[in-house]
Amino acid sequence: MSTTGRARDTDPLAGSWVTMADNEHSAVSNGSRSGRDAVGAWLSDHLVDLVQWRRHIHANPELSRTEFATTEFVSAWLTKAGLIPQVLPGGTGLICDIGPEGPRIGLRADMDALPLQEFTGLSFASTVPGVAHACGHDAHTTILLGTALALAELPQLPVGVRLIFQPAEEVMPGGAIDVVASGAMAGVERMFALHCDPRLEVGRVGIRVGAITSAADTIELVLDSPGGHTSRPHLTSDLVYAIGTVITGLPGLLSRRIDPRTSTVMVWGAVSAGKAPNAIPQTGMLTGTIRTGDHETWSLLEPMVREIVDGLLAPTGVRYQLNYRRGVPPVVNEVQSTRMFEDAIRALGPDALADTMQSGGGEDFSWYLEEVPGAMARLGVWSGEGEQLDLHQPTFDLDERALEVGVRVLTDIVLRAR
């Protein structure tokens, strides 16, 4: 496949990336081994399809809760394979069961794109102005679709599987919470997901026990005062002074009241107030985010923020309205689920398993893990050459060899399950 960080059209399938390598860490049963051989054969026959699917989805991105065409595309391929997909309430996203009845493993992919303009220059770049797949969800969807079709061709599976093609990951509090509310988790005992990581080279997959993402909440503080002349601040409530007090005071006091080992950080993203140098403004606004890697701390943040803000602003006389929007909890990888991921990753080769750190970003996969144990891993998508572009950049692209890696890992988790 592509040997650069861009998914070029010239010979995208130069060869399979993965050499399957059993070792002392990845012993498998004969049934699992034959299943893996069958998956390998399916991949050899369908690598072109994986690339074409990803490029089709990439060229036709859809924003959160509008993923109708993507849902129809996935549903059509699942139906063609003899499976029975069920579209989720709202008409975007779907679930599909494979394998025997009874307790199931859940595999999830998010489907939505971002509201930004793509500047990759690719022949299959977004055809929708202002909308782009810059977070790898086109790859996530393709990998889960490939996993579904590969597993569907096996005569039997050791465990039932529920595929969840999820809408609206990019908007808080995320589409996962609606998927859970719809009852789609009924019978699912464990959940797994992959997320593209441009910091890891293709062929490597990172995972860790414990928190791998952070909780992410949003604060909007609207302030109001009578306003006045800057020569007479004593006759009014100095709104700009009050804003400055909150800008420095809230992050500072949070850092003194919360254990630093929780990786809690409060950062302002936007501040606005006034226009004239000699007029104390009547209104102002601050917005920012609070992130933490600790689930217990997340539950304490909102009341603590409200208490601190009130204490900071009360002496100023400025009126305020605090809008605190809870986002998502951290994704906390459960031990056994992480070990299952690690075994599947090691089967790729001796250097495939990578260490990874906790991210400050939020991920709504965490809502599934509020219901059942599970784990998320980071799929390397960097070619190893050129610039490492970050997620959510308008020039972001990925090495398409990662599609095969993702299918191998997810199918292997299923085949090893008992």
Residue ranges and their predicted role:
Residues 57, 107, 137, 163, ...:
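Divalent metal-coordination and catalytic microenvironments
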Residues 2-10:
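Extreme N-terminal basic, low-complexity initiation segments
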